[in-house]
Structures are given as structure tokens and as C-alpha cells.
Design a protein with these regions (language model features):
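A conserved beta-strand-loop-helix scaffold within acyl/acetyltransferase catalytic domains
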Residues: 29-49, 53-54, 58-80
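Conserved GNAT acetyl-CoA-binding A-motif
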Residues: 102-115
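Conserved active-site tyrosine of GNAT-family acetyltransferases
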Residues: 123-125, 172
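Conserved small/polar residues in nucleotide/adenosyl-binding loops
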Residues: 172-178
Length: 179
């Protein structure tokens, strides 16, 4: 299993990743925003994604989004193909995405939103803390990404204060002593 920073050569997996995210949303019955293959391809092409491959078979994926002129970094679209679940792969992918975020945006507030129990567990194990949505980016472009989620009406009705998702933030890198 190889977990690596995605490059242009990995764009061939964008459609498969998009379908995997869609299928996961259907199976779970909870909200997951849809990501088009074209959108995922831009993340891959820009080096703002991590892909896991077993030989040449897609196994998992996650990407980085930057908001507020680099003040916020979101980890989004974490997905593991069904045949690779239950092996700790999601946590390994998330760690790699975290390392890339630290390398590129060392002072950014790193966050994510999820309805998934598995992602919540991973985030907790990696030191993320649950927070109110007011502690996340106020960039309207970020919140537009939620429009394809079936729970978007909740988010809009509450003026982005509440949803079924839980926001989590990692503060660990912001409190490390400088040497």
C-alpha cells in the first residue's frame, strides 16, 4: 500500500473517488457533500491531495482546502474504498494530509466537518477537538461546498450555526514550543 501526495498522473482516479464518496453517502444515509471528478482533479493537480494506492488500485483519498488567505486549512473528502476499510488506512491518510498541511501552512487553523463516526474517532485520536461552527472559517466559499449535502437546509436555517456535522479543529501544532 502506498500513501502519497497526489500528482497529475493520479487524475485518472478522480471519477472513481467521486463515485466512492457518493456511494458512501448513500450507504450511510447521512450528509456528505458531493464532489465532482473535475473538482477532485483540481485538488490532485495542485498537489493538495493524498491518495492511497494498492498496486494501481484506488484505496483511499483526502484533500486540502485553504480558506481565509491561508488562515484556515480544511481536510475534506476523506474516503476509503469499501474493500480497504477496517485496516487503519483512513487514519494513515489523515496523518499524511496533516503533515502536508503543516508543511505548507504551519500557522493555519486545521479543521474538518463530518457526520461520520469513524472520522470523528480518527480526529479525536489525532488530537482534534470538537468546536462550534463559529470557530471555523467564515469564508462563504467554504460553506458553498455544503450545498450538495442533503442537510444543507439545516445549515442555512440556522445561519451556519448548527448542522448534523461536527466541526473539529487541531490546535496541537499551534501550541507546540518553537525551537
Amino acid at each position: 500500500m502506498n500513501i502519497l501526495r497526489a500528482k497529475a498522473e493520479h487524475i485518472i482516479y478522480a471519477k472513481q473517488i467521486s463515485l466512492c464518496i457518493d456511494e458512501s453517502a448513500k450507504v450511510r444515509g447521512t450528509g456528505i457533500a458531493r464532489r465532482t471528478p473535475e473538482y477532485l482533479a483540481t485538488k490532485i493537480e495542485n498537489g493538495n491531495a493524498v491518495i492511497a494506492l494498492d498496486e494501481n488500485q484506488f484505496a483511499g483519498f483526502c484533500y486540502i482546502e485553504v480558506w481565509g488567505h491561508g488562515k484556515y486549512v480544511a481536510h475534506s473528502g476523506l474516503i476509503v474504498a469499501p474493500e480497504f476499510r477496517g485496516r487503519g488506512l483512513a487514519k494513515k491518510i489523515k496523518k499524511e494530509v496533516f503533515n502536508i498541511s503543516l508543511e505548507q501552512y504551519p500557522k493555519a487553523k486545521i479543521f474538518g466537518i463530518t457526520t461520520g463516526q469513524a472520522v470523528m474517532k480518527i480526529n479525536y485520536e489525532l488530537g482534534y477537538k470538537p468546536v462550534h461552527f463559529s470557530e471555523l472559517t467564515d469564508d462563504p466559499e467554504f460553506w458553498k461546498g455544503c450545498q450538495t449535502c442533503k442537510n444543507f437546509d439545516i445549515l442555512t436555517r440556522t445561519e451556519r450555526k448548527l448542522c448534523l456535522c461536527t466541526g473539529t479543529v487541531s490546535y496541537t501544532h499551534l501550541t507546540l514550543p518553537t525551537t
